[in-house]
UniProtKB/Swiss-Prot annotation:
Topology of the protein relative to the lipid bilayer: Single-pass membrane protein
Protein's name according to its UniProt entry: Photosystem I reaction center subunit XII
Xref: HAMAP family: PSI_PsaM (MF_00828)
TM ranges: 7-26
Keyword field contains Thylakoid: yes
Subcellular location: Plastid, Chloroplast thylakoid membrane
Biological process annotations from GO: photosynthesis
Keyword vocabulary terms for this entry: Chloroplast, Membrane, Photosynthesis, Photosystem I, Plastid, Thylakoid, Transmembrane, Transmembrane helix
Source lineage: Eukaryota, Viridiplantae, Streptophyta, Mesostigmatophyceae, Mesostigmatales
Highest rank taxon of the organism: Eukaryota
InterPro entries noted in UniProt: PSI_PsaM, PSI_PsaM_sf
Gene Ontology CC: chloroplast thylakoid membrane; photosystem I
Family stated for the protein in its record: Belongs to the PsaM family.
Length: 30
């Protein structure tokens, strides 16, 4: 059974990696 804390951590991790990938993509695009 997945707890709410694990879901929140997973969401924050996905959001963090998404922002990181977006910044890296824009840097490489330049």
């Amino acid at each position: 059974m997945i707890s709410d804390i694990q879901i929140m951590v997973a969401l924050f991790a996905a959001l963090f990696t998404g922002i990181l990938a977006l910044r890296l993509g824009t840097e490489l695009y330049k």
